[in-house]
Amino acid sequence: MSKEVLNDAEQRMTKATEALGRELAKLRAGRANPAMLDRITVEYYGAETPLNQLATISVPEARLLVIQPFDKSSISDIERAIQKSDLGLTPSNDGTVIRITIPPLTEERRRDLTKLVKKSAEEAKVAVRNIRRDANDDLKKRQKDGELTEDDLRRVTEDVQKLTDKYIEQIDQKAEAKEKEIMEV
């Protein structure tokens, strides 16, 4: 009984930390990363299509992204979508590929990005704590219904807390690593 509550909580906490990892990958840290362009959608034949479905994105150098569209006629649409995005990137094309040079980050922009990292990490921690609360509520309900003894409740509640501590630690480590990467000049 209590194992399924623990397993469910662990799965949900894992998803929360993975979501944080995806969110942090999208933040620009002065290095080129194809994940930076994940949120960009392109108006393609009347439909909003994710950029990564229209082109291959490669990183030939640390500060350069190369986008090679599958359909050459979509180059101007892709370029327009990148310019309209809030990433502050300037694409240039030579008719067959689009090149994006990633400019070095200013000190002010680095500080803004670290604030975003802290905010994302805090949201992930709140999600993990909410999962802990849900699990504990479920366990208390089961104890009230007679499915768990008082001792079992205490033991499993401690296990849920250990799980929470483990995932909060992972979140802190991810955030710290990203902040370090951003502040690196």
From Swiss-Prot:
<comment type="function">
    <text>Responsible for the release of ribosomes from messenger RNA at the termination of protein biosynthesis. May increase the efficiency of translation by recycling ribosomes from one round of translation to another.</text>
</comment>
<protein>
    <recommendedName>
        <fullName>Ribosome-recycling factor</fullName>
    </recommendedName>
</protein>
<dbReference type="Pfam" id="PF01765">
    <property type="entry name" value="RRF"/>
</dbReference>
<dbReference type="InterPro" id="IPR036191">
    <property type="entry name" value="RRF_sf"/>
</dbReference>
<dbReference type="GO" id="GO:0006415">
    <property type="term" value="P:translational termination"/>
</dbReference>
<keyword id="KW-0963">Cytoplasm</keyword>
<comment type="similarity">
    <text>Belongs to the RRF family.</text>
</comment>
<dbReference type="InterPro" id="IPR023584">
    <property type="entry name" value="Ribosome_recyc_fac_dom"/>
</dbReference>
<dbReference type="GO" id="GO:0005737">
    <property type="term" value="C:cytoplasm"/>
</dbReference>
<dbReference type="InterPro" id="IPR002661">
    <property type="entry name" value="Ribosome_recyc_fac"/>
</dbReference>
<dbReference type="GO" id="GO:0043023">
    <property type="term" value="F:ribosomal large subunit binding"/>
</dbReference>
<keyword id="KW-0648">Protein biosynthesis</keyword>
